[in-house]
Amino acid sequence: MPATHHSSATSAERPTVVGRIPVLDVRPVVQRGRRPAKAVTGESFEVSATVFREGHDAVGANVVLRDPRGRPGPWTPMRELAPGTDRWGATVTAGETGTWSYTVEAWGDPVTTWRHHARIKIPAGLDTDLVLEEGARLYERAAADVPGREDRRELLAAVDALRDESRPAASRLAAALTPQVDAVLARHPLRDLVTSSDPLPLLVERERALYGAWYEFFPRSEGTPHTPHGTFRTAARRLPAIAAMGFDVVYLPPIHPIGTTHRKGRNNTLSATGDDVGVPWAIGSPEGGHDSIHPALGTLDDFDHFVTEAGKLGLEIALDFALQCSPDHPWVHKHPEWFHHRPDGTIAHAENPPKKYQDIYPIAFDADPDGLATETVRILRHWMDHGVRIFRVDNPHTKPVAFWERVIADINGTDPDVIFLAEAFTRPAMMATLAQIGFQQSYTYFTWRNTKQELTEYLTELSGEAASYMRPNFFANTPDILHAYLQHGGRPAFEVRAVLAATLSPTWGIYSGYELCENTPLREGSEEYLDSEKYQLKPRDWTRAAREGTTIAPLVTRLNTIRRENPALRQLRDLHFHPTDKEEVIAYSKRQGSNTVLVVVNLDPRHTQEATVSLDMPQLGLDWHESVPVRDELTGETYHWGRANYVRLEPGRTPAHVCTVLRPSHPQIGGSHTT
């Protein structure tokens, strides 16, 4: 669509694509404006555009946000991001939830143009009276649009001074360039030839879509010595400890009846015994499907009790939604058209090479897409009626993107607070598109990014333009993934990855047992756990671990506390990396308003590393020559840091510094590590 501008043009004039003042390449933009950019309530983000005009006259620009009712808010002035680039930007802040829009307005700035000429001509004595009269007329025009009496009086006083022939020309000009006049014109600039970009959509969602700490656990493992298989009632006893560690979301694997046909045994064996509990993702049996509770976990009333107890502790429930079936699911006989049938009439089981899932049937989506979408929405709404507002969707990349777009639009159309997390470890294009069509959060490649270069490159990508549509959830481990870094690095590796996940991403999580540093693989070279909880009950002695000091729960608790106390860690976009002289040491900072957090991590879980951290002081909101006290929030120590700083990080003792930058008024209570 063509840009629009406000002028005295007649209706016979044809609109142009560019507009009178060109406004080009407005960002953020998602799928050329077909999908909304994303933010959460209170989140700040940059809107930028290329703005210029013919000749040498000055231009200005501003951003206008319109709320879900279409009402424009106060516009935000933009600035040229780098001199001579014509790239303008401004930071705006999202308001209430809903669908907003934003536009960039560009305009000719006659006052700035006049000031530039006047500063040259008046000292040179060129066209003095004419130049001053031009200024007076511009200021009169500007004053006419100023609503406040005091501000208008300030500009009119400048007009009088410009026309006061009893004063020297330099004095008349100076009266029009005072800080007071500047302040009024900054609030109420004189704008000519205002040209607006096309509006772009902005979806503002609740904060949990961006920020939170997740804890995954299997309720069935929370039994008692007399009744090993846990229920929702026994699992609810674990909730206070989870809340005490500072988590916000409790994520449950599927809670539905588990099939018996081709049931997997321990460690993924193909021959299950009568005591094997099966894989929760093999959903469905004669006892019910996706809308039913596994009888061994209890009843729907027991689930409601679990949700209620979680809510009392400030915990939300995230429920796994795996759109697949065991061979025993009621759908297999009721809806045969929903499955792939081979020439011999059998149904093909699921595969994700090299993994095979003989106990699971995948869904075929093209024979009855309407029926599948209707049933999916019904199931989701069933669990929403029982207090679930977050769904972790299993392998959405193996289903049609259009299907998810339809389902999420239906749910969020009436319940915009419901959050969908895409568990899709797949190609970048698919992951990006799933985020763009509605998934509020995404799993990421974080597990496989372990070196300084890998982390820097990946987080630079995630915190850049991708942040306008894709929100990462950094799980440090999952029931499926035990990375070699954790297998071979021991407890220090678990500490390092927890610090990275909790401070790099506003949303992070762990799967139960991470705090105990469980790291025995199924076999060398495998990322599967030995005695994986996917296939068996796994009771843990939390009390003994705390008593013997074999848990890193205190570190996890401290990290979540730091996140809650520091707004900088609850956002993604303002992330900057700082140079260090060791590949094993990574440094980065985050800022939100006056809150700045600086993190330095030893990526080597086996060896002590010493390094010099060279801080980019302007990125911390400081001048290059300044030094400030920083408090390590992990230890309580305070250091005085400047541009170059020595650090010594010892695995098992000091895996990292997580520092808040203090203002000079804060007392220094520790030694100086400045070099």
Curated annotation (Swiss-Prot):
Catalysis: reaction(s): alpha-maltose 1-phosphate + [(1->4)-alpha-D-glucosyl](n) = [(1->4)-alpha-D-glucosyl](n+2) + phosphate
Gene3D superfamilies (alphabetical): Glycosidases, Golgi alpha-mannosidase II, Immunoglobulins, Phosphotransferase system, lactose/cellobiose-type IIA subunit
GO biological process, one term: oligosaccharide catabolic process
Swiss-Prot/TrEMBL site (Transition state stabilizer) positions: 480
Active site: 394, 423
A molecular-function term among this protein's GO annotations: alpha-amylase activity
InterPro entries: GlgE, GLGE_C, GlgE_dom_N/S, Glyco_hydro_13_cat_dom, Glyco_hydro_b, Glycoside_hydrolase_SF, Ig-like_fold
Highest taxon in the source lineage: Bacteria
A Pfam family per the record: GlgE_dom_N_S
Quaternary structure (record): Homodimer.
Protein's name in the database: Alpha-1,4-glucan:maltose-1-phosphate maltosyltransferase 1
Organism per entry: Streptomyces coelicolor (strain ATCC BAA-471 / A3(2) / M145)
Gene symbol of the encoding locus: glgE1
